């Protein structure tokens, strides 16, 4: 019997975790956990940064990331650059760059995070940033 080709996962069926950087996360799809049925080089997660909070400065060593902001407003910090972001903003974050997202708005920042190659715990590290 052939395996189902259509894969469907609902956000609310995904476990809520707190990521290393403090972001509230639901991993939607990651070949590391979801097995070899997916021919993907990336992972995708749904993330939230609550009002008044900031993710901890961190970097991915080998992977790049793309954030797509669904809701909320804030400041995206990548190395020495800072830009305002809001719904519809897409941010590319190269490997080995220090990054964090600061919620400056009145609602949660909700975004999708795509990591390529797919996210692995040994590829992420916290970084101390001088104020």
What is each residue range found by the language model?
Residues 73-75, 82, 98, 108:
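Structural motif
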Residues 62-64, 69-74:
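Glycine- and acidic-residue-biased ligand/ion/polar-headgroup-sensing regions
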Residues 80-95:
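Short acidic-glycine-tyrosine-enriched beta hairpin
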Residues 29-33, 45-60:
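Conserved short histidine dyad/triad with adjacent acidic residue
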Residues 95-121:
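Ligand-binding loop in jelly-roll beta-barrel domains
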Residues 54-56, 75, 91, 95-101:
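Histidine-centered metal-chelating micro-motifs
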Residues 1-41, 126-131:
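A short, N-terminal "cap"/entry segment at the start of jelly-roll beta-barrel domains
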Residues 36-39, 55-60, 102-104:
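Short histidine-centered beta-strand/loop micro-motifs
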């Amino acid at each position: 019997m052939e395996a189902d080709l259509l894969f469907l996962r609902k956000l609310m069926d995904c476990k809520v975790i707190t990521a290393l950087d403090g972001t509230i996360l639901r991993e939607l799809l990651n070949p590391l956990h979801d097995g070899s049925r997916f021919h993907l080089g990336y992972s995708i997660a749904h993330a939230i940064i609550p009002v008044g909070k900031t993710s901890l400065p961190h970097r991915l060593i080998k992977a790049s990331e793309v954030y797509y902001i669904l809701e909320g407003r804030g400041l995206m910090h990548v190395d020495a650059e800072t830009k305002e972001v809001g719904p519809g903003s897409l941010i590319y974050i190269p490997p080995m760059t220090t990054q964090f997202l600061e919620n400056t708005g009145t609602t949660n920042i909700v975004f999708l995070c795509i990591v390529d190659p797919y996210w692995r715990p040994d590829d992420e590290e916290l970084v101390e940033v001088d104020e």
